[in-house]
Amino acid sequence: MSADSADSVPSPRSAFATTLQIVSVVSFTFICYLTIGLPLAVLPGFVHDELGFSAIVAGAAISVQYFATLASRPLAGRCADTLGPKRTVLRGLAACGASGALLLSAFAFARWPAASIGLLVASRLVLGIGESLVGTGAILWGIGRVGTAHNARVISWNGIATYGALAIGAPVGVAISHALIPAVLGMLVIALAALGYYLARLITPVPLVHGERMSYASVLTRVLPHGLGLALGSAGFGSIATFITLYYAARHWPNAALSLTVFGTLFIGARLLFANTIKTHGGFRVAIVSFAFECAGLLMLWLAPVPHVALVGAALTGFGFALIFPALGVEAVALVPPASRGAALSAYSVFLDLSLGITGPLAGYVAGAFGYPQVFLCAAVAAAAGVALSTVLYQRQARLSGSGAAA
């Protein structure tokens, strides 16, 4: 066996060691999203019931975090490229802690609604910045520790940490709020951020990557096709997350929450079991198959005559969506110099933020005009467009590789 072939098949021990290296830093993403998830399901009720504001104000107060995340993506990429991933993560965790302090103050000022809502909005804005810094920094920190050959595994594990923390945080936050008082959530956010900050300081930083740095606008232009693919794939996730419970209710079906659980379980399972296929077969080929699975699942949701069929549809959608972000992300990051990886990752992630922000109101219009099943039909069309786009990108890559080899 040649040295090259031996290196291409890592031993179980080296694979486990690599996973530990990755998990040790994406754990900070888990902590960050735990600080997001814990108050997430509690805050709308607090704003509407305790402070007396309308449901629109409650929704806006929560959603402002996502706009802060979107707006701070360029900052996160620049920090990761110029200050280093570790310092970027530390700044993000500090922002998460500050958001907890502002959240605690918002609960304390509940008797003065205007002051309380102002503090809450400030908390959400700071948390959005922290989310962007930690998410981008943790991925680049992981890549710096294990090498670019494991880009897909790092991105996949970071996604598992993200969605796992949100899935755990929301019900735990509701339970704590009911058992104690909501203000405890602010204290818990501060404590988690402080713990993450302490642990992050103990881990060795990775060297800064020097060399050519592209402008953010140039990076955004270069990763635009990949980002559009991510946006198309995210429409399915956004549709299920927002409308599956209303879809079940309109059909008078029970256990809508089970469909979300199945979606999340298949999502995490696919990332755990199949992340290495991106390295083996290439990002575009994996994306084509992933979009096809997602499209099939969404079509099943559209046509489902009984809950069991809808459940299978949700499962297929979660399985398909799981690898779209890392598959296209690996190809996007490969298009820029090493010194601009942070900018590429943040620019690429912008399309996820935009897609989730746009899907809600657009799908709401479709549901109101044509019914809830048509929401999933539209998302299936988006996934089918993702298949076509990924196929075009794969063929273009093959042509460029062929011309390069011929030269």
Swiss-Prot record:
Which cellular compartments is it found in? Cell inner membrane
Gene3D superfamilies listed in its UniProt record: MFS general substrate transporter like domains
Identify its membrane topology class. Multi-pass membrane protein
Pfam families associated with the record: MFS_1
Which InterPro entries does the record associate with it?
Answer: MFS, MFS_dom, MFS_trans_sf, MFS_Transporters, MFS_YhhS-like
The answer to whether the entry has keyword Transmembrane is: yes
A GO-annotated cellular component: plasma membrane
Q: Which UniProt keywords apply?
A: Cell inner membrane, Cell membrane, Membrane, Transmembrane, Transmembrane helix, Transport
Superkingdom of this entry's organism? Answer: Bacteria
User: Where are the membrane-spanning stretches?
Assistant: 22-42, 51-71, 101-121, 126-146, 154-174, 179-199, 227-247, 258-278, 286-306, 309-329, 347-367, 369-389
- Example GO molecular function: transmembrane transporter activity
- The disulfide bonds in this chain are none
Chief localization: membrane
Q: Which family does it belong to?
A: Belongs to the major facilitator superfamily. YhhS family.
For this entry, the protein name equals Uncharacterized MFS-type transporter BMA2043
What species is given as this protein's source?
A: Burkholderia mallei (strain ATCC 23344)
Starting at the broadest rank, the lineage of the source organism is:
Bacteria, Pseudomonadati, Pseudomonadota, Betaproteobacteria, Burkholderiales
